[in-house]
């Protein structure tokens, strides 16, 4: 034992065995102490060794614990426990095994074999469970592979591939991967590249969410099904996890050592293992230190070139360009396979293939029209992401929302429950009252309470029954999916008897139960729980994500849109043509007959100041979003210089503020359904109009970072007072002198606002007084303004040059100032009504 050189884990096991024997009062360290000490190690090799031979470690641990309890105990013994004869023999055998295997250290697996080869109770226990020395040795070689114990901490090199990777073929065999629909050409290209002699390393390049990882999962499913050429038959496809390989690597060289062990395992498999690395660009620089150029990418280059490592990678176009293309030696070892975004039709096919999985997971039914809506609406409205990922997410969230409603108490039950609680509180208050009225009320209340309790019980029972019926359907679908998976596995394994029993016996039986259960779940017409995901549910999720009303027009909204001119006319006076044009544009968009590749409507409002151009934009925002501030306002007077154009779309690369985005593009990205007001557009530099050309024609704009911002759901409104006061021909001549023909031609309409007549001014006075009245209502004050007073305000508040804007100032001065003085002097009190009339001399208004 002089040359005994244990590993760290071996030393820990011996120390733990000594402590266990000492604390239990055992005079000797027996083999059972050693076995338990090894099984207690969290990341030790003993438990995996037993699992490999089909023995449950917990069962062995429990039986060993019972053996330990039967050992003799010595009380009052101050000496330290010594190794027993059997333990010493096991350690000696372990040392001999280490020498035989050309290992430099004695490790816990050597000791495990030494215990099994002895004649102790532990040896009988292990052999009795099927862990004989021969079986353990075979498992030991399988776990260790080609590795030798050359360090004091060798355990991390065992089962390195299993530790730092996921077996996709095993997951596919167990039915854990989602079905892959389509993508046959891409999978065929991957198979072709993998079948090459050298540089057999395909890399899938495409935008995020187009299905690169799904293609690799599809390859794993084909390998399991045997639907691949002979060169890939029975191969293992593993997904390497570089994150877990880097995690916990505290010392320099530890990551490289882990990676080398994994690569050696792959190399010694003689082409049996195909490796997949998602986010392939992460290999560049992974594990590199400041002075060293040895990263994961450089470590795998030689194996890639020689064809010893068959690697499938997946990364996005930007990251491939940024990381892989910089290293020409690494890039030439890969064969690019471009993965494009599927069409809407292909996406519908993919969703149909995934439908069953999502129905089973959420326990709801998903209609085919919902799948079509998910593909179409995501393509139309969610422009920053890619199909099929965004469509799958829509279906998933819509089903999740419906499941949450099923699991929550219906609103109807909540309302009755609150009513019952209120009646019970009222009953407790009336019980002690002696007067006749209270007694009569108590009697009536108790009758109502009994009725409501009965109704609550009935509703709760109905809800529970409907919920149970839905859950039964969900459980049967889960059973059916499990049985189908078992049937496929039995066919692959050649167990035709089991496959026939499942296919022609148990599966039809469950299908029959499911057919009977589905009508039960839908039996009543007045169901409390909705269990079907339809197009409206998908549209609601789109609206929640983007703020765009993508759902069908509700009855209330239809009526609101039809009387849109009246609603806008309450705030914008005397501009019927402009109001009508804007209303038509909004109706076209909501009815779905507008061009989907252009903005909802784009207008140039012309006319003198103060006639309602900006007010119409505010009124439109208020009508659509119930908030007049819900619009993007760009004051074009701030963009009078050539270089200020960059503020709209963001600074170009290399300039300060490049990472901040543009004021216009960022605002529309955050709120894609909005009114965009370009106020006083004639004051902007002419280059600004060139930027707006793409917005008006194609409904999109590219910002300084190269991202496309979608303007198709916006209403761009440009206001200007060019040629104000002139005839229509003069106004249009002024417009043509400032704006280029291609700019004017892209607008939906150029609207010239008319001047205001006296009657319209009185209506504007009413609007201003109504706004003042809302502010006074907080103090319960009312104004009674006479018609002469309104005409006086209209006459004195209008200026042909300034339009109706001075009216607001006049209302504040003529009424607001007097009212403020009266309030401060205590002449007016809350709840008073103040008449407003013209003074006899006609010079001012008088209150009170």
Curated annotation (Swiss-Prot):
Q: Where is this region: Repeat 1?
A: 6-71
Q: Where is this region: NBD2?
A: 557-755
Instruction: Identify the stretch(es) annotated as NBD1.
Output: 159-341
- Output a single Gene Ontology CC term carried by this record: cytoplasm
Say which domain of life the source belongs to.
Bacteria
Pfam families, from UniProt?
AAA (PF00004), AAA_2 (PF07724), AAA_lid_9 (PF17871), Clp_N (PF02861), ClpB_D2-small (PF10431)
Listed disulfide bonds for this chain? none
- Assigned keywords, A-Z: ATP-binding, Chaperone, Coiled coil, Cytoplasm, Nucleotide-binding, Repeat, Stress response
Q: Where is this region: Linker?
A: 342-547
Q: InterPro entries of this UniProt entry? A: AAA+_ATPase, ATPase_AAA_core, Chaperonin_ClpB, Clp_ATPase_C, Clp_N_dom_sf, Clp_R_dom, ClpA/B, ClpA/B_CS1
Q: Which residues form the Clp R domain?
A: 1-146
What is written about domains in the entry's comments?
The Clp repeat (R) domain probably functions as a substrate-discriminating domain, recruiting aggregated proteins to the ClpB hexamer and/or stabilizing bound proteins. The NBD2 domain is responsible for oligomerization, whereas the NBD1 domain stabilizes the hexamer probably in an ATP-dependent manner. The movement of the coiled-coil domain is essential for ClpB ability to rescue proteins from an aggregated state, probably by pulling apart large aggregated proteins, which are bound between the coiled-coils motifs of adjacent ClpB subunits in the functional hexamer.
NCBIfam families associated with the record: chaperone_ClpB (TIGR03346)
How it assembles, according to the record, is: Homohexamer. The oligomerization is ATP-dependent.
The entry's family comment says: Belongs to the ClpA/ClpB family.
Q: What is this protein called?
A: Chaperone protein ClpB
Originating organism = Mycobacterium leprae (strain TN)
> What gene name does this entry carry?
clpB
């Amino acid at each position: 034992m002089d040359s005994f050189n244990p590993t760290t884990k071996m030393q820990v096991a011996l120390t733990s065995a000594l402590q266990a024997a000492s604390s239990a009062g055992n005079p000797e360290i027996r083999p059972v102490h050693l076995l338990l000490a090894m099984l207690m190690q969290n990341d030790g090799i003993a438990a995996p060794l037993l699992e490999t031979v089909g023995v449950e470690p917990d069962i062995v641990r429990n039986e060993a614990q019972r053996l330990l309890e039967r050992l003799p105990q010595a009380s009052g013994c101050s000496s330290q426990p010594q190794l027993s004869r059997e333990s010493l023999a096991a350690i000696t055998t372990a040392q001999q095994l280490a020498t035989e295997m050309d290992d430099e250290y004695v490790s816990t697996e050597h000791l495990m074999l030494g215990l099994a080869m002895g004649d102790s109770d532990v040896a009988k226990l292990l052999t009795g469970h099927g862990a004989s020395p021969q079986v353990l040795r075979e498992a030991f070689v399988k776990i260790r592979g080609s590795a030798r114990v050359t360090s004091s901490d060798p355990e991390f090199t065992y089962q390195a591939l299993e530790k730092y990777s996921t077996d996709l073929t095993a997951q596919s065999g167990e039915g854990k991967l989602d079905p892959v629909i389509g993508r046959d050409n891409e999978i065929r290209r991957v198979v072709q590249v993998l079948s090459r002699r050298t540089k057999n390393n395909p890399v899938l390049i495409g935008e995020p969410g187009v299905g690169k990882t799904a293609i690799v999962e599809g390859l794993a499913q084909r390998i399991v099904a045997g639907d691949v050429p002979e060169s890939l038959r029975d191969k293992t496809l593993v997904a390497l996890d570089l994150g877990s390989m880097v995690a916990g690597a505290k010392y320099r060289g530890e990551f490289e050592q882990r990676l080398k062990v994994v690569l050696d395992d792959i190399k010694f498999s003689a082409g049996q293992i195909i490796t997949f690395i998602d986010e392939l660009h992460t290999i560049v620089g992974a594990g590199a230190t400041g002075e060293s150029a040895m990263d994961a990418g450089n470590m795998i280059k030689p194996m890639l070139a020689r064809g010893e490592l068959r690697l499938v990678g997946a990364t996005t176009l930007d990251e491939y360009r940024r990381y892989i293309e910089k290293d020409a030696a690494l890039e030439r070892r890969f064969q690019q396979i471009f993965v494009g975004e599927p069409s809407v039709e292909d996406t519908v096919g993919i969703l149909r293939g995934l439908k069953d999985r999502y129905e089973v997971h959420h326990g709801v039914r998903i209609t085919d029209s919902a799948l079509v809506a998910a593909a179409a609406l995501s393509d139309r409205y969610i422009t920053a992401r890619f199909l099929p990922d965004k469509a799958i997410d829509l279906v998933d969230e819509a089903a999740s929302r419906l499941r949450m409603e099923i699991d929550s108490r219906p609103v109807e039950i909540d309302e009755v429950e609150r009513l019952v609680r209120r009646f019970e509180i009222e009953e407790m208050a009336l019980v002690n009252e002696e007067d006749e009225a209270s007694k009569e009320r108590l009697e009536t209340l108790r009758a109502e309470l009994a009725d409501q309790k009965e109704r609550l019980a009935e509703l709760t029972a109905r809800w529970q029954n409907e919920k149970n019926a839905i859950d039964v359907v969900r459980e049967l679908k889960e059973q059916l999916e499990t049985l189908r998976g078992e049937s496929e596995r039995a066919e692959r394994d050649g167990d035709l008897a089991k496959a026939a029993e499942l296919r022609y016996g148990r599966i039809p039986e469950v299908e029959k139960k499911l057919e009977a259960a589905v009508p039960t779940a839908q039996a009543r017409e007045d169901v409390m729980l909705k269990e079907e995901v339809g197009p409206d549910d998908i549209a609601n999720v789109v609206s929640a994500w983007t703020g765009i009303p993508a759902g069908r027009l509700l009855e209330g909204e239809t009526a609101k849109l039809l009387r849109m001119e009246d609603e806008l006319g309450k705030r914008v006076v005397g501009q019927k043509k402009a109001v009508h044009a804007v209303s038509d544009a909004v109706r076209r968009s909501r009815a779905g007959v507008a061009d989907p590749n252009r903005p909802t409507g784009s207008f140039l409002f012309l006319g003198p100041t103060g006639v309602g151009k900006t007010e119409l934009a505010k009124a439109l925002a208020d009508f659509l979003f119930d908030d007049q501030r819900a619009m993007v306002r760009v004051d074009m007077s701030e963009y009078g210089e050539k270089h200020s154009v960059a503020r709209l779309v963001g600074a170009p690369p290399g300039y300060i503020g490049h990472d901040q985005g543009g004021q216009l593009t960022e605002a529309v990205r955050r709120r894609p359904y909005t009114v965009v007001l370009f106020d006083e557009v004639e004051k902007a530099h002419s280059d600004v109009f060139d930027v707006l050309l793409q917005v008006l024609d194609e409904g999109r704009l590219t910002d300084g970072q190269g991202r496309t911002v979608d303007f198709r759901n916006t209403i761009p409104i440009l206001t200007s007072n060019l040629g104000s006061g002139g005839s229509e021909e003069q106004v249009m001549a002024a417009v043509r002198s400032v704006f280029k023909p291609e700019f004017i031609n892209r607008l939906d309409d150029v609207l010239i606002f008319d001047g205001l007549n006296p009657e319209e001014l009185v209506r504007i006075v009413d609007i201003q007084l109504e706004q003042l009245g809302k502010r006074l209502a907080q103090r319960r004050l009312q104004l009674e303004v006479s018609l002469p007073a309104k005409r006086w305000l209209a006459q004195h508040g209008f200026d042909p040059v300034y339009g109706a804007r001075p009216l607001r100032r006049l209302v504040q001065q003529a009424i607001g100032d007097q009212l403020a003085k009266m309030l401060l002097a205590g002449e007016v009190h809350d709840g008073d009504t103040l008449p407003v009339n013209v003074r006899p001399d006609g010079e001012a208004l008088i209150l009170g």
